[in-house]
Curated annotation (Swiss-Prot):
Taxonomic placement: Eukaryota, Amoebozoa, Evosea, Eumycetozoa, Dictyostelia
Full protein name: Uncharacterized protein DDB_G0284767
Organism: Dictyostelium discoideum
One of the Pfam families matching this protein, by short name: AAA_21
GO MF annotation, one: ATP binding
Length: 757
């Protein structure tokens, strides 16, 4: 690896420089520094980042009057980050008070604290590390210091953000090979690289592949569409190393399986791969080899197939899934994020649903793999925003004299990326949608759930709004009605006003599906065309409880559960509520039975599977049955309690798929509730009576809402039913589908008219 800039610095210090803000020694206690000198006359330091402070204090003890050469990979002219090179020199023993800033030509020198510093001396013979704490007062000190400088390094209002930018440059690297320079800045994974034709996307990916160490990866894999379709390359043996390793393991496992292996393996490679294929609803599975050839064998609908029999999309998904499984099973010694996966336009053959399968798999591996993809497909860029992808533009550098150099910069959104690859022909404006829900409680829940599941910078933003009116507005309507009744009932104006008031009370209740439908109809009554879509008319969606299952309609989407409360009544949410709240309950409380038999928090976290959590909650609810029924005096609710407890003991169980692809079995009552009306509300109100957090029903209801919502917010996303993510995705993508459908209908109508004419 070659470095971009070299400095030679002597020890002369100008006298007219402003004092540098000191850092309190007590905030950064002394640490041991070790330096090995390779040359008694010159020390060469290779930096990924210039951390200055006590480091130079130690250097001076060794260097005395010798010349020090700093060699760094940070470019002199860097318009992307507007970075100036910096160094601080220590003149006296008490460096905290007398530190000076040395200014060179076109260079400014600063000091600030980085949480992780790694400095390689010469050829990585020795490493010096420091881990100082962050200093919240540094922002103020630095801002005062910058005000005294004659030449301002960067015009920014928020100096703390400026230092964050400098910190990110620590990840910048320079690839220099055969006269091809690539400047890479801080990257966030997974990511898409886009570029115009001729810029060098493929060349860039191959350079990264051959220099994977620059992105701190021990292993890199490069795949393009040709390699995926043929399961070979024939040009670069290094690029097909993964295929060779995979086939070797596949053949070895196949041979062991024919020997009735009983001790060497507990799981064959096809078992692991088939689990992933099945969880993603792919129609084929991998079989053991017949040992007569090196070819992969598959099964689809009881028919044996070879790799070349699969469709191009099936090949793409198989290769990616096989790769992920292979490295998880065979390279467990490689730490997280030390495997780099480079995918060069491999997704172009996939339709939208298959793209979601691919991106969802990548999303789930975001903590285990660094994944870089290149594409020119606007559909890929749009869908990837739902799965946490970042977007980077590869372009030729204007700041580096070599015309064969390129640089990468991050794009703000998937809309920018789509506009770029389409040369401005496509303009995407669905970055946010207004979603009407039935009441304030729905709005709070969906807001929390959406942020938990889609906390990405480039995804469609959903804004949830209660479609009903406020309590005081409903009260005002009632008061107006009472006044009107006292007036002359024969007056036609009074009758008209009374009729209007009644209509408002019916359609603008405090929440409810009628309010949602009315609001959506009112705001989305125009026909959905390409023009109206750009104007935002199709950006308003209604999200309704399942209720009687008759809520679907224009701009309306129904959740899979009877009501949102069903998500909060989930046994997994109740488990975390018990974990968080019941352990704090005093022994004399009516909850003492659960308290005394509940494992410690640590035991709950480490020993219970998701299915065990369900069983745990049901067991604890049953323990409270007698006590709860004895407390209840209302006849109707005594009957409801009987129905509830009969329901949780039922052997009729429903499969619930979770975010981590696990499937748990729960009693039907947790999915559909019970009772002729208000099924979800009946379930929640039953839990209110069982847990009885307050002194009365109203207080207990409010407290249970708060506690279940807190438990939902704090628990892992792995425990959320996957149908909730699917519902949000329906909302995000609704407008695009409507435009397509309506445009097709319009075209069909036009064609019909032409035929008639």
């Amino acid at each position: 690896m070659k470095y971009g800039v070299k400095y030679e610095i002597d020890q002369s210090i100008p006298n007219d420089l402003p004092d540098f803000p000191f850092i309190d020694e007590k905030d950064y206690p002394s640490e041991r520094w070790e330096i090995t000198l390779k040359d008694q006359d010159t020390i060469i330091f290779s930096f990924n980042f210039l951390y200055i402070g006590k480091f130079l204090n130690e250097i001076k003890r060794y260097c005395k009057n010798r010349i020090i050469t700093f060699e760094t990979n940070i470019p002199k002219e860097n318009n992307f980050y507007l970075l100036y090179h910096f160094i601080i020199w220590k003149n006296k023993n008490n460096w905290c008070e007398d530190s000076k800033v040395l200014i060179f030509k076109n260079s400014m020198i600063f000091i600030f604290c980085e949480t992780r510093i790694k400095i390689d001396i010469d050829n990585n013979e020795i490493i010096i590390k420091s881990n100082p704490k962050t200093d919240t007062t540094l922002e103020l000190k630095m801002s005062k210091f910058l005000e005294n400088l004659k030449e301002k390094p960067l015009q920014v209002k928020n100096y703390y953000y400026f230092f964050t930018i400098l910190s990110k440059v620590s990840n910048s690297v320079l690839i220099n090979d055969d006269g091809f320079d690539i400047w890479i800045y801080s990257l966030e994974y997974p990511l898409f690289i886009i570029a115009k034709n001729g810029t060098g996307k493929t060349r860039f990916l191959k350079k990264v592949f051959t220099n994977s160490g620059i992105l701190k990866c021990k292993q890199s894999i490069y795949l393009n569409e040709f390699m995926v379709l043929s399961f070979s390359n024939g040009v670069n043996n290094e690029e097909v190393k993964f295929f060779e390793e995979f086939l070797n393991v596949y053949k070895a496992h196949s041979m062991l399986s024919t020997l009735n292996n009983k001790g060497f393996l507990t799981k064959y490679i096809w078992n692991s791969i088939n689990e992933v294929l099945k969880s993603n609803n792919l129609p084929f599975s991998l079989l053991p080899s017949d040992l007569k050839s090196d070819r992969l064998l598959f099964k689809m609908d009881d028919v044996t197939l070879y790799y070349h029999d699969l469709s191009s999309g099936e090949k793409t998904l198989f290769i990616v899934f096989a790769l992920i499984v292979f490295y998880q099973d065979n390279y467990s010694g490689i730490a997280d994020e030390e495997v780099l996966l480079l995918l060069d336009e491999i997704e172009t053959t996939l339709h939208a649903q298959s793209l979601r399968v691919l991106f969802n798999a990548i999303h789930k591996q975001r903590n285990n793999l660094k994944i870089i993809m290149s594409t020119h497909n606007s559909t890929s860029l749009r869908i990837a925003s739902e799965y946490g992808f970042h977007y980077y533009l590869l372009e030729k550098s204007l700041t580096i004299s070599d015309g064969n150099s390129v640089k990468i910069k991050e794009l703000k959104s998937h809309e920018n990326a789509i506009s770029y690859v389409s040369d401005g022909m496509l303009s995407v404006v669905d970055s946010s949608k207004l979603v009407f829900v039935e009441d304030d409680d729905d709005s709070k829940f969906y807001e929390i759930a959406y942020k938990k599941l889609f906390n990405y910078p480039h995804t469609t933003r959903l804004v949830f709004c209660n479609a009903g009116i406020k309590n005081n507005s409903q009260h005002d309507l009632n008061q107006v009605s009472l006044i009107l009744k006292k007036m002359d009932g024969n007056d036609e104006n009074v009758k008209s006003i009374q009729k209007l008031i009644n209509t408002l009370k019916e359609t603008n209740t405090i929440g409810g599906k009628t309010s949602v439908k009315e609001k959506v109809k009112l705001l989305s009554e125009k026909s959905v065309t390409e023009e109206s879509f750009r104007l935002g008319n199709s950006q308003i969606i209604g999200l309704l409880d399942k209720d009687d299952g008759k809520n679907e309609g224009e701009f309306l989407i129904t959740i899979d559960y009877y009501s949102y409360e069903m998500f909060l009544c989930s046994p997994l949410v109740l488990f975390y509520m018990i974990k968080n709240e019941f352990l704090k309950t005093s022994p004399d409380s009516h909850l003492s039975t659960i308290t005394t038999t509940t494992p410690s928090s640590q035991e709950i976290n480490t020993n219970l599977s998701q299915q065990d959590m369900v069983c745990f909650v049901i067991e604890k609810l049953i323990e409270k049955e007698v006590e709860t029924k004895n407390r209840e005096t209302n006849k109707t609710w005594k009957e409801y309690l009987d129905i509830f407890y009969e329901g949780i003991r039922s052997t009729t169980l429903f499969d619930v798929k979770l975010e981590n692809q696990a499937i748990i079995k729960v009693p039907e009552i947790f999915i559909n509730g019970f009772g002729k009306k208000g099924k979800g509300h009946n379930l929640f109100d039953t839990l209110v009576r069982i847990f009885a957090f307050g002194l009365n029903m109203q207080e207990s209801t409010e407290k249970l809402k708060i506690k279940t919502l807190e438990a939902f917010e704090k628990m892992s996303t792995d425990n959320i039913p996957s149908c909730l993510r699917d519902t949000f995705l329906k909302v995000m993508n609704y407008s695009l589908k409507k435009i397509t459908n309506n445009n097709n209908n319009n075209n069909n109508n036009n064609n019909n008219n032409k035929i008639k004419n």
